[in-house]
Each structure stands twice: as structure tokens, then as C-alpha cells.
Amino acid sequence: MRNHPSLPIDADRLWRSHEEMGQLGATPKGGVNRQALTAQDQQARALFTQWAQAAGCIVETDCVGNLFARRLARDPDLPAVCTGSHLDTQPTGGKYDGAYGVLAGLEILRALNDAGIETERSIEVVAWTNEEGTRFAHSGSALFAGKADLEQAYNATDPTGIRFEDALTAIEAKGPLPLGNRPYDSLFEAHIEQGPILEREGYSVGIVTGDRKSVV
């Protein structure tokens, strides 16, 4: 990408997007219950697709419902830069867990459009399937990366006995793309802090340098 001044984003637009997305599965106390492959998840996918297409993106879905929105570059054959997260939530989830990573990525694409900037590499925003894992054991990102078996995932059931593949089909989320055939130059995920440190120290953003594993 050529050097440009800092790219201004439209914070009000990003906020409005969160508020609108947050209405899908909204709970009385301000949270969100938008579990993977439910009617609410289907609505969220449709809304993201609508916004991404309005921003000029090519939107595609793979065979486990991972949703990809790509803004093409001068050289579309170069491996893309990818960012994103997930739109599904826990039963008692929040508006910003996961959704922020998807909508922040979308806002970058919108801001690039506003500034008339053409990038050297395509930029792709992804919404992974079932990242919270409240209904099914396998996440879309693990399947994409080849870390889980597709047939086992398809046959996995939620607590009510619904198969993963059947749930995909029921909300028309099973796409034609094979798993993993999308080379990336780099991948980033923006995520809300799930702890007190940044807020306590007065920082607006932090960079993750490692994982901490919790044992319950």
C-alpha cells in the first residue's frame, strides 16, 4: 500500500452500525443473544452482507458458513490482508464481543472508499462461524485452518440434537466455497478488552503478545 496520512474513520457510522447490529437478538438488559446458526444469526449475516455489498465488496461464503467480504485491489492476485472476527454471541453476550472485529473491519473499507484510496492488496473482512461454540464444538476458523475434521463437524449436534450441517442449511449459510482456499498475506483481529487493564491504565488500544490459558 502506498503511504497515506492517517485514515480517518467515521466514528458515528461505526457506532450506528453497532447499534443496528445489536438489535438482532437484543436482550432486555442491553445484551445480545445471537447464537450461531439461529434466525438472529441469519439476520446478522444478511445485514453484514448488505453493508459489505453497499461498500463495493465481493461477498462469498464457504461450506461451513464463514462469510468473506473482499474489497479488490490494484493487483487482485496478491494474497489479501484479512481482518475480522465473529457475529455470533453467547446466550448472555454483549454487543461488541466479536461484532466489533467485523464492523471495525467494515469501517476501514468504508473509510478507504470515502478517501478514494486504492490499495495494493485486496482487503478482506471475515465473519467466522460459531466462534463462541455455544451450540457446536467446532469453530469456523478451526475448520478453515484445517484444525478440525469437516465430516465430524457436519455431524456434530447441538444440545437439542440439531446437526451442524442441518443448521447451516436451515439458515442458508452453507456456501459453495471449499475450506481454506484463500491465501492471506496477514491477518488481524480487533477485539474488545475482556478485562480491566487497558481501561485502568488509560490506554485506548493494546497489542496482544501472547495467550494466557485458563484451567477450570
Question: Where on the chain are the PLM-derived regions?
Answer:
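Acidic/histidine-rich catalytic neighborhood of metal-dependent amide-processing enzymes
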Residues: Q90, Y100-V205
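Basic/polar N-terminal segments that are highly enriched at the extreme N-terminus
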Residues: M1-I9
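A short, structure-level motif marking secondary-structure boundaries and short turns
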Residues: R2-N3, V32-Q35, D149-L150
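Short Gly/Pro-enriched turn/cap motifs at secondary-structure boundaries
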Residues: I207-D211
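Acidic/His- and Gly-rich active-site-bordering loop/insert found
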Residues: P8-G94
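Conserved small/polar residues in nucleotide/adenosyl-binding loops
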Residues: V215-V216
